[in-house]
């Protein structure tokens, strides 16, 4: 006689952990796809394949490709706000003359760690639509304000070149990508 084996159902905690891991894989795969190929050229099928998950899980976890894009961009912006927020906070401890130099180093290091940020901006900048507006409101405008403020303070001290802050913003962003 063959003994019956008991199969234990996965615990609720395991299901939640698995769902979070799946969502994280999808967000990371989507970010890679959207930042390199763009929104229109990235199919949900290819994103699910890159994430190594079953077909249909984008619809299950996010509802739509647009909501996945928002989740991926939000993840990237949250990372940006956290990492660059820490860098900005540390600038307050630096003397006035060192702030600009430390800022540039922190921003270039961040862009090296997360090249998807500027890649996504380039991809979305090709089409004027809701995604570009979302990025501008959520990331570019607030960050631009910080950059201009730091540059203007350095210019007042004579430790920054004599040109407009917006030129500096584009020079640093271009150099960092």
State where each predicted segment sits.
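N-terminal intrinsically disordered/low-complexity leader segments
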Residues: 1-21, 32, 88
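Amphipathic alpha-helical segments used for helix-helix packing
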Residues: 112-134
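Generic hydrophobic, amphipathic alpha-helix propensity
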Residues: 22-31, 47, 68, 72-76, ...
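Hydrophobic alpha-helical connector segments
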Residues: 85-117, 157, 165-172
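Short, solvent-exposed beta-strand-terminating loops
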Residues: 173-177
